[in-house]
Curated annotation (Swiss-Prot):
This is Nicotine N-demethylase CYP82E4. Involved in the biosynthesis of pyridine alkaloid natural products, leading mainly to the production of anabasine, anatabine, nicotine and nornicotine, effective deterrents against herbivores with antiparasitic and pesticide properties (neurotoxins); nornicotine serves as the precursor in the synthesis of the carcinogen compound N'-nitrosonornicotine (NNN). Catalyzes the demethylation of nicotine to form nornicotine. GO terms for cellular component: membrane. There is a cross-link at K254 (Glycyl lysine isopeptide (Lys-Gly) (interchain with G-Cter in ubiquitin)). One of its GO terms (molecular function) is iron ion binding. It is an enzyme of class 1 (oxidoreductase). The chain crosses the membrane at residues 2-22. It is found in: Membrane. Its cofactor is heme. The gene is CYP82E4.
Amino acid sequence: MLSPIEAIVGLVTFTFLFYFLWTKKSQKPSKPLPPKIPGGWPVIGHLFHFNDDGDDRPLARKLGDLADKYGPVFTFRLGLPLVLVVSSYEAVKDCFSTNDAIFSNRPAFLYGDYLGYNNAMLFLANYGPYWRKNRKLVIQEVLSASRLEKFKHVRFARIQASIKNLYTRIDGNSSTINLTDWLEELNFGLIVKMIAGKNYESGKGDEQVERFKKAFKDFMILSMEFVLWDAFPIPLFKWVDFQGHVKAMKRTFKDIDSVFQNWLEEHINKREKMEVNAEGNEQDFIDVVLSKMSNEYLGEGYSRDTVIKATVFSLVLDAADTVALHINWGMALLINNQKALTKAQEEIDTKVGKDRWVEESDIKDLVYLQAIVKEVLRLYPPGPLLVPHENVEDCVVSGYHIPKGTRLFANVMKLQRDPKLWSDPDTFDPERFIATDIDFRGQYYKYIPFGSGRRSCPGMTYALQVEHLTMAHLIQGFNYRTPNDEPLDMKEGAGITIRKVNPVELIIAPRLAPELY
């Protein structure tokens, strides 16, 4: 099988014409172009620069190093598309304030066609009538504060059940528990319950859900794989599959869609039997969307069923993966900073006590816990480069001319560790957020863990509710130490997201009365 680079080289002669057409300018811009990193080749651009360079750090770290060399605004080419990387307050504000509407489109990636319901998923859809209508539905009917309030008891019950499960795993003073796996199970089970009304437990769930979990992990891998068409978006290359990724995408999508289709049919049948509003039957997210969405096409050629399944998939991706990832980093930071952990425990003991568990209504009084969550999101934002944007027309960023069709990476990780904006930027210090009004809403352009502007994350409120409540329970309920009494390894994995290479494995001990578990 040909490697990605061999495939490119073999087809390079077919791309010269398209390359020159792609890069041709009708007139010279009045503003200068941003700095471009050296080493680019004709046609393929800087693909070699990021291809197996022996650096296994996250892409955000690599791009951060380039910003140190070439400045907080620079460009490079991944094949034909031009990529703009920004990491300064001024440039980020230009992109998500002044030019917010211009940068509201999404670049086309092949996985969006084959895995993302032909880009019907909310985070993949281009800015336009379909996206606006679907986002409005999600924000007002599915992820609104009032709707999430109705699911408050579901979140609490699920977290309580998982805490009890964690307690039963304690075996003396030497049993090591994989907290990373526990967090993944908790968040996956919680979102499945809220979306489809299903109770899922590892090893006890139905076969379909287990198959979906496998397909979900395959999606995460395939969506980050290099595909020829992504670098050379030419119709001919859409059907070239030297690497076998398209075949794998189709197979994975089939497994994912079969689960969502089954859930959808169950809910449609339930509605037909008029069981949705029967006493004792709660409305989950699919019930809500079915009640609000007509059976008509919603634009862009999507059917109602496709939109529902695509929306469900978007919610699962955000809730099951990024939330667990963030809490995992948060607990690792606390274990390595025992003074902060002790202070958080003392705050909960004082404000809540030790004779009941923290509830969502308590969070507003737990100021130090809120500061911890903010600081974890500063150091390890769930989307360190955000989802890529693309400008629909020429614009100006930090005084530079940015041609139409440029792909935008906002290096949030670099921005939120900028020593010009943050003191001791690489140090875990929740105190920095105690006497400040900086929040998560994306209006403080030095702190945008959930993005900013029109394309900011619609699931932010849900994510913060789960993160605060889960971390509060873990802080309140247990004491922790590492198996070797050494600090946890904080090595970051390669790729677009920031995953901890090694799981958080701990020896835990309860700190509340046994009857509370």
